């Protein structure tokens, strides 16, 4: 179901001042070309076993889900939901996928009375010839009999042993390709083979090829309860570029975790690697580049989905996180420095003296927020501000353009701000640069540095014009908050006093 974004009425523009509850879940979204993900539907999975039951334990979808649901080592929570969406890079056939046949024996199906199956294929109602399963020798043989009954010029039918399902594909591809649920009055055959909606069958519409941009727009028109996304499919540089452009234009709402398996990032200061030649050259923001296969990209999604926003001091950086089941893919200083010079994150093996550690590095994301945790925090804060204001204005009250109205907005903001302080997204006691203080004070017309130091945040509501009141739009409001950043390295001297 498509919805009107709340940002139509509550528009919050993320911004930063650089040095001289939960209204959104940090779920991960994975793009895949697997046919078993229905076209146009955002599929939710709540465990890796849900994925393997459909796509098998050797599928990249299961391997990614397994890594995702593990979260990061020692996390206080683990991911609760994984989203997947199908990439359609070529015209696709519509299909009908049966309900799960696990536990249904061949003998049971052979005992089903002969009958017909009625469904719609490519817009035309089709009734099969009588299908007799009494002499079937296997589930594959049953698929052949169903295909013959419906007509092999209209459909192809296949038994999927890993998924334990039958799939009936249209013989055509494209937007007009279609196979509907079997009609409820089809009879015993359709019910026994679980081809009806009542028996948990699934339909996927046919589709023309869909661009990366349209794919992502279709996703957010269906589901916005996620922050980071990645592709399990190996995309071309042109397709990756299109996804980078989309993420960069998302107003700091979504981040693209792009993986790179080529050797180019391991050459220091390499202007021809993807990040430098595409991401940096075009100024794309909200891109989290990571060296390695799609499994290494999963670490960013697993990290984000394991953040406990309800925990006191729950904020934690991506750097130093360990991911069980994943081997480090960088173990020498030269490669690590080369990757950093090109803007890539990686999973490293570190050691000095007898101390050894495996952890992710460095957690950098392109754009104004610089670090992945800061990026995720601002998405969470802004989403919760929208949620707070939506609750405020739908609570059967109205708020005028005076101290009472502004106070109500301030009160709604306080709950979000204090939760962010408790979590650690907003930090108190941070000494800002003089340049930062000057920019903020100039914007609000007074010195608020003491408030930012002691409180960590400040809500600025300027005097409203008559035209703003007439439009009923509270304009120019700015929520200042101090991120504070996190310590990720130590440079010091060790001095012996003799």
Residue ranges and their predicted role:
Residues 153, 194, 343, 424-425:
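Short glycine-centered helix-capping/turn motifs at secondary-structure transition points
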Residues 1-26, 33-37, 42-295, 434-439:
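Polar low-complexity, Ser/Thr/Gly/Ala/Asp/Asn-rich disordered segments used for subunit assembly
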Residues 149, 171, 232, 357, ...:
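Generic structural signal for bulky hydrophobic/aromatic residues embedded
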Residues 1-62, 70-79, 360-498:
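Structured, hydrophobic secondary-structure cores that serve as assembly/anchoring elements
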């Amino acid at each position: 179901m498509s919805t009107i974004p709340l940002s139509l009425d509550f528009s919050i523009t993320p911004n930063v001042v650089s040095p001289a509850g939960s209204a959104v879940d940090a779920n991960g979204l994975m793009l895949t070309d697997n046919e078993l993900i229905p076209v146009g539907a955002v599929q939710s999975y709540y465990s890796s076993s849900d994925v393997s039951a459909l796509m098998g334990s050797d599928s990249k979808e299961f391997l990614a889900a397994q890594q995702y649901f593990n979260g990061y080592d020692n996390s206080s929570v683990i991911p609760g939901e994984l989203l997947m969406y199908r990439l359609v890079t070529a015209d696709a056939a519509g299909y009908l996928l049966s309900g799960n046949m696990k536990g249904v024996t061949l003998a049971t199906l052979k005992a089903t009375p002969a009958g017909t199956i009625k469904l719609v294929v490519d817009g035309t109602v089709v009734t099969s010839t009588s299908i007799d399963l009494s002499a079937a020798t296997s589930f594959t043989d049953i698929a052949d009999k169903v295909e013959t009954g419906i007509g092999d010029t209209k459909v192809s039918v296949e038994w999927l042993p890993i998924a334990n399902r039958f799939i009936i594909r249209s013989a055509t591809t494209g937007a007009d390709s279609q196979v509907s649920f079997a009609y409820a009055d089809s009879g015993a055959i359709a019910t026994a083979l679980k081809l009806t909606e009542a028996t948990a069958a699934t339909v996927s519409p046919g589709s023309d090829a869909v661009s990366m941009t349209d794919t992502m727009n279709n996703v957010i028109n269906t589901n916005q309860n996620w922050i980071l996304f990645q592709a399990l499919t190996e995309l071309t540089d042109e397709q990756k570029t299109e996804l980078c452009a989309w993420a960069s234009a998302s107003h700091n709402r979504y981040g693209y975790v792009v993986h790179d398996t080529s050797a180019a990032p391991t050459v220091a200061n390499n202007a021809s690697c993807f990040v430098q030649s595409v991401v940096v050259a075009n100024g794309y923001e909200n891109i989290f580049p990571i060296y390695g296969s799609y499994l290494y990209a999963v670490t960013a999604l697993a990290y984000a989905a394991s953040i406990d926003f309800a925990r006191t001091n729950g904020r934690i950086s991506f750097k130093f996180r360990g991911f069980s089941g994943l081997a480090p893919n960088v173990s020498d200083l030269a490669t690590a420095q080369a990757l950093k010079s090109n803007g890539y994150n990686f999973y490293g093996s570190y050691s000095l003296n007898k101390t050894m550690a495996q952890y992710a590095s460095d957690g950098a994301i392109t754009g104004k927020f610089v670090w992945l945790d800061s990026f995720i925090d601002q998405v969470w804060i802004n989403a919760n501000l929208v949620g707070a204001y939506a609750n405020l204005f739908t609570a059967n009250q109205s708020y005028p353009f005076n101290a009472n109205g502004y106070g109500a907005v301030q009160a709604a903001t306080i709950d979000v701000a204090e939760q962010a302080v408790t979590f650690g997204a907003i930090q108190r006691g941070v000494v800002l640069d003089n340049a930062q203080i000057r920019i903020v004070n100039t914007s609000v017309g007074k010195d608020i540095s003491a408030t930012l130091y002691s409180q960590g945040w400040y809500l600025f509501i300027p005097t409203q014009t008559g035209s703003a009141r007439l439009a009923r739009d509270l304009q120019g409001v700015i929520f200042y908050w101090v991120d504070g950043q996190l310590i990720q390295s130590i440079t010091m001297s060790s001095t012996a006093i003799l």
